A protein has these predicted regions:
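Short loop/turn segments immediately following the C-termini of beta-strands
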Residues: 90-93, 139-141, 191, 240-241, ...
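Residue position within the beta-strands of beta-propeller blades
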Residues: 134-136, 188, 237, 286, ...
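Extracytoplasmic beta-rich repeat domains
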Residues: 115-128, 143-145, 161-180, 208-230, ...
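Short coil/turn segments that connect the beta-strands within blades of beta-propeller domains
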Residues: 131-132, 183-184, 232-233, 280-282, ...
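A short loop-to-beta-strand structural motif that recurs across blades of beta-propeller domains
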Residues: 147-149, 194-196, 245-247, 291-293, ...
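Loop/turn-rich, solvent-exposed surfaces of beta-rich toroidal or solenoidal domains
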Residues: 332, 358-435
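Aromatic (tryptophan-biased) beta-strands that constitute blades/sheets of beta-rich domains
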Residues: 5-16, 26-119, 135, 147-168, ...
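Blade-level signature of beta-propeller repeat domains, shared across WD40, Kelch, NHL, RCC1
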Residues: 332-334, 428-429, 451-482
Length: 482
């Protein structure tokens, strides 16, 4: 009798447990069927892979940075070789070399001749060239320092280096700007919004500005990409700060000559300032995060137009008929603006606003305008034309031509010289093609760099071409055989 009762009690205990287990299994099964595996996935963008957060980026606001730093001298000497590339996008701000140089139409099987190469800190900063010297704003990861480096164009030997200590975490590279150089001075903008001016011949320090500390600049995502402008002895900068959208600084003294108010709170973008003359008046055109504006040589806003792109890397491009074209990636597309002038002043009118699948758009590099046509590389979200090199008539409509599905490119640079386009792909493959109004005509292709993220703009001085990937710069001989 006791055994029967004990067995009955065991059954009474087991049944509820089995019922609970069954309900639990059904609950877990229902959760499994209801689970959306993509629900917690986030869009993966450059800089979101463990790079500095906003609070990390702001840490330098609490650190006193000695921008004078130190100057080191080496055994390199300036070259007597001809040619110059004095600033971002070249002498005329259009990424077209107009010097009378003859470049090879074909390359040997071994590719263009490598004259020299140097190791760099990880980044996308590109060189400028003047008087046989190559200037590049680098980041020394071992010493944790921004460094303006001067090399000989002849052999790549370092001549001098001006550096200052600055903590920074890798965020898809570090330095990514291009110095502006004149016979008198060099102006740089560092990844954390530090501006410096040094003497060109000696590297001696003149002055420096911490845009975050002094003007309330918000450091852009993935560090600063704005390249400085030197114009008539003034450094023209766009802090996008609390009280200075744009400003001019005397290169000799470091004195602020004028500041443009920023009542709308537009922020610094990766775009660079373009000096332009429209309707007979000079102005500085800049695409900030918030909108595009034209500012007079005295710092007065002449016109402005809102634009909601959140990440802007390309610079404005002037188009015939007093128009300006601006484009950006991450779905922003492009904007074409008409600038008019009456007795009451300037005005800006939107002509077209297009998505990346609708018309020409570029994510990282600035399109080239040549002979009335626009050339560029479509972004990944460019629809059927994604990552193709394309040619468009600024008047609108379908593309004049594209490189086709078998010729796609990444975020690397492209520029024009001697009737040819040169396109550097992400993996260091250099493509040369004929400049044409009728179609894509490839002339040669060779992998000239072994690294990755070859995004830094190309420079050409004489027949020597300077290119880089994320950690190495090479100098190639591109001249035609005589």
């Amino acid at each position: 009798m006791h055994r029967v009762k004990q067995k009955r009690n065991s059954v009474l205990v087991a049944v509820p447990i089995l019922i609970l287990c069954g309900w639990g299994a059904l609950f877990l099964l229902s959760r499994w069927f209801a689970y959306d595996p993509a629900r917690n996935l986030a869009l993966s963008l450059p800089g979101m892979d463990g790079g500095p957060s906003g609070s990390d980026r702001a840490v330098t606001n609490e650190v006193q940075v000695n921008l004078a730093g130190k100057l080191e001298k080496f055994d390199g000497v300036p070259s007597s070789l001809p040619g110059s590339w004095p600033r971002f996008r070249g002498a005329d701000f259009d990424n077209i070399c107009k010097a009378d140089v003859k470049l090879a139409d074909r390359w040997p099987e071994s590719g263009p001749k490598v004259l020299w190469s140097v190791t760099l800190g990880e980044g996308h900063a590109a060189p400028t060239v003047l008087n046989g010297c190559v200037y590049l704003f680098d980041y020394d990861e071992a010493k944790r320092a921004d460094a303006l480096r001067c090399f000989s164009l002849a052999d790549g030997k370092e001549i001098w280096r001006r550096s200052y200590t600055l903590p920074a975490k890798r965020n898809h590279g570090l330095s990514r700007t291009i110095p502006a150089v004149t016979e008198d001075c060099i102006v740089t903008v560092g990844p954390r919004c530090h501006v410096s001016c040094v003497e060109t011949a000696t590297g001696n320090f003149r002055w420096g500005i911490d845009l975050q500390k002094e003007y309330g600049t918000t450091e852009p995502l993935w560090f600063t990409g704005q390249c400085p402008l030197i114009d008539n002895g003034l450094a023209i900068l766009a802090p996008g700060g609390s009280d200075a959208l744009m400003m001019a600084v005397d290169c000799k003294t470091g004195a602020v000559v004028w500041k443009t108010p920023n009542p709308k709170g537009w922020k610094m973008s990766h775009s660079s300032i373009l000096p332009l003359t429209l309707h007979g008046e000079k102005m500085y055109v800049y695409a900030a995060v918030g909108g595009m504006t034209g500012v007079s040589p005295a710092g007065k806003v002449l016109w402005e137009i809102p634009w909601s792109a959140s990440v802007i890397a390309p610079s404005p491009v002037p188009v015939a008929g007093n128009k300006i074209f601006i484009t950006a990636g991450y779905g922003a597309g492009s904007l074409m603006v008409q600038i008019d002038k009456t007795a009451d002043g300037f005005s800006a009118k939107e002509i077209s606003r297009t998505g990346p699948q609708d018309w020409l758009a570029c994510e990282q590099q600035t399109p080239i305008l040549y002979d009335g046509l626009l050339y560029g590389i479509m972004p990944k979200d460019g629809g059927a034309l994604k990552q193709q090199f394309v040619c468009y008539d600024p008047a609108g409509g379908e593309p004049v031509w594209s490189s086709g599905k078998t010729h796609r490119f990444g975020l690397g640079p492209f520029f024009m010289a001697d009737g040819k386009f040169f396109i550097l792909d992400d993996d260091g493959t250099l493509t040369m093609l004929a400049v044409s109004r009728t179609g894509y005509e490839s002339l040669a292709q060779y992998k000239v760099l072994d690294g990755q993220d070859a995004w830094g703009p190309i420079a050409l001085a004489g027949t020597r071409m300077l290119l880089r990937d994320s950690t190495r710069m090479v100098c190639l001989e591109m001249g035609a055989e005589k």
